[in-house]
């Protein structure tokens, strides 16, 4: 066993829970923050052209790019959490099969999606709303980011997820952070130095594609150099079993669906706010960017928690599994409270960073101070979804995702808008997240009570034969592998 493998085993089994969580979560949080800065910087650089058609052309590609993220989530979250559970159950050979399958699944999906996009570029862009003025800009950007960049993007996100789920969070976080920093550096270089005026959107696309290729190459070399017993590129060990494939997609699909519904919620909010005034739309648009900071930190914390919870669940170490959730939940609540305090105090300054118009600043300040109150409940709803993903409970995670966005958040937007207008739209996030967090907690409590009362770990569909004992109970697996 190599030094990295021993270190991973120490993190999963021996290291104190707060220290283990920090080792897993801090690199992930840093990479999340760098990607947040990159996304803002990309928008900033394209906006510097003062060409609305160029800005619109780049924005049109977002739904296509989100498909790449969804595919990466299927392979990364579905495969990654399954690998962590298999390692906890001491099934390293099955974990190897899932690891290689996840990587090649991401590569083939990326190639397939890139070819489809290239073939059907014009009808796809027109379907998304491209006009004669924006089509060429959108085509240039999509060619670089999707046709050239889809495969390395999906593969990079998948490999970083897999690395984190075998305990190598530092390497995964460094790779994603490196890609974001390279992109931030290359954007102005290609947009304003190397390419002539009028080609800025092409420069942004080249910078994004190149940074993703570099990140993917780095991750490939890292996995080969580490010689990890689980992560490899050979398919000679065979395919995962039917049960493991069911778990792969059972957890991966809900993880992929979440970002789509998240974006749908934002679209509905924008449309409803636009009906009130352009200033209100501008204000909420800025708020949605500013509020991403604690959200991305919370997601990074959840992603760091998942491998620890998954491993100890299958290892039969329920006390440590519960301690991981408690530590992550406590840290997330503390960060949320700090974020609320900072945003309440400095809301006007934060809005002025993006715009100087007094009316927009005033409205944006109000909206930010209202929406940030939901931070704690939003984090709690996120952490329970990730927790059920870690346990292989894909159906429960899917139920919570659908309930959150389709059954509660989006209907609440329409209701609060009708009752209280644009300020009702701002308050809807808090109202919805209180309901979602309470529902998530009830389902979590029910699942834990069933485990302790029956002595059976509810692993139906998790694709893993569990080992060990839980608090004196014998573990049984309801899924026949």
Which residue stretches match the model-derived regions?
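Transmembrane helical elements of multi-pass membrane transporters/channels
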Residues: 23-42, 144, 179, 211-215, ...
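Short runs within selected transmembrane alpha-helices of multi-pass transporters and secretion channels
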Residues: 76, 145-164, 172-180, 204-219, ...
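Helix-terminus/linker motif at the lipid-water interface of multi-pass membrane proteins
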Residues: 37-55, 125-132, 189-199, 260-293, ...
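Interfacial/gating helices of multi-pass transporter permease domains
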Residues: 46-66, 132-139, 201-203, 243-251, ...
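Hydrophobic transmembrane alpha-helices of multi-pass small-molecule transporters
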Residues: 67-70, 114, 183-188, 216-220, ...
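Short alpha-helical transmembrane segments in multi-pass integral membrane proteins
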Residues: 1-25, 83-149, 196-253, 309-374, ...
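Small-residue-rich hydrophobic transmembrane alpha-helices
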Residues: 55-115, 153-167, 171-172, 283-341, ...
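N-terminal transmembrane alpha-helices
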Residues: 13-44, 48-49, 63-78, 82, ...
């Amino acid at each position: 066993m190599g030094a990295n493998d021993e270190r991973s085993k120490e993190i999963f089994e021996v290291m104190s829970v707060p220290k283990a969580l920090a080792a897993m979560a801090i690199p992930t949080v840093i990479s999340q923050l760098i990607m947040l800065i990159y996304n803002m910087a990309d928008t900033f650089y394209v906006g510097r052209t003062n060409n609305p058609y160029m800005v619109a052309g780049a924005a049109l590609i977002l739904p296509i790019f989100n498909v790449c993220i969804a595919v990466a989530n299927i392979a990364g979250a579905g495969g990654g959490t399954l690998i962590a559970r298999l390692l906890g159950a001491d099934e390293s050979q099955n974990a190897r099969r899932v690891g290689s399958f996840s990587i090649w699944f991401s590569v083939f999906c990326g190639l397939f999606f890139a070819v489809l996009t290239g073939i059907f570029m014009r009808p796809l862009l027109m379907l998304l709303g491209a006009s004669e003025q924006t089509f060429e800009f959108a085509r240039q950007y999509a060619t670089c980011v999707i046709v050239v960049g889809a495969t390395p993007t999906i593969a990079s996100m998948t490999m970083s997820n897999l690395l984190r789920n075998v305990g190598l969070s530092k390497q995964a976080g460094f790779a994603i952070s490196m890609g974001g920093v390279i992109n931030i550096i290359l954007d102005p270089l290609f947009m304003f130095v190397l390419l002539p005026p009028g080609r800025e959107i092409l420069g942004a696309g080249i910078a994004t594609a190149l940074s993703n290729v570099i990140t993917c190459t780095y991750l490939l070399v890292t996995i080969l150099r580490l010689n990890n017993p689980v992560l490899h590129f050979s398919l000679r060990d065979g395919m995962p079993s039917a049960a493991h494939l069911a778990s792969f997609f059972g957890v991966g699909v809900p993880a992929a669906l979440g970002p789509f519904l998240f974006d749908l919620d934002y679209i509905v909010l924008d449309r409803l706010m636009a009906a009130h005034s352009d200033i209100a739309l501008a204000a909420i648009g800025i708020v949605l960017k500013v509020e991403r900071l604690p959200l991305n930190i919370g997601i990074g914390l959840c992603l760091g928690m998942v491998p620890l919870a998954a491993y100890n669940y299958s290892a039969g170490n329920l006390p440590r599994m519960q301690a991981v959730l408690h530590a992550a939940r406590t840290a997330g609540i503390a960060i949320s409270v700090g974020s609320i305090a900072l945003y309440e105090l400095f809301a006007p300054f934060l809005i002025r960073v993006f715009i100087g118009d007094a009316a927009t600043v005033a409205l944006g300040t109000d909206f930010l101070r209202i929406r940030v109150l939901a931070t704690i409940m939003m984090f709690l709803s996120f952490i329970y979804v990730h927790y059920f993903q870690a346990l292989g409970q894909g159906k429960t995670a899917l139920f919570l995702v659908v309930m959150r966005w389709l059954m509660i958040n989006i209907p609440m937007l329409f209701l609060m808008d009708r009752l209280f207008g644009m300020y009702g739209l701002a308050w809807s996030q808090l109202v919805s997240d209180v309901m979602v967090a309470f529902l998530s907690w009830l389902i979590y409590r029910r699942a834990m009570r069933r485990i302790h009362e029956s002595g059976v770990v509810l692993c139906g569909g998790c694709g893993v034969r569990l080992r060990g004992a839980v608090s004196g109970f014998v573990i049984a697996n309801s899924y026949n592998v």
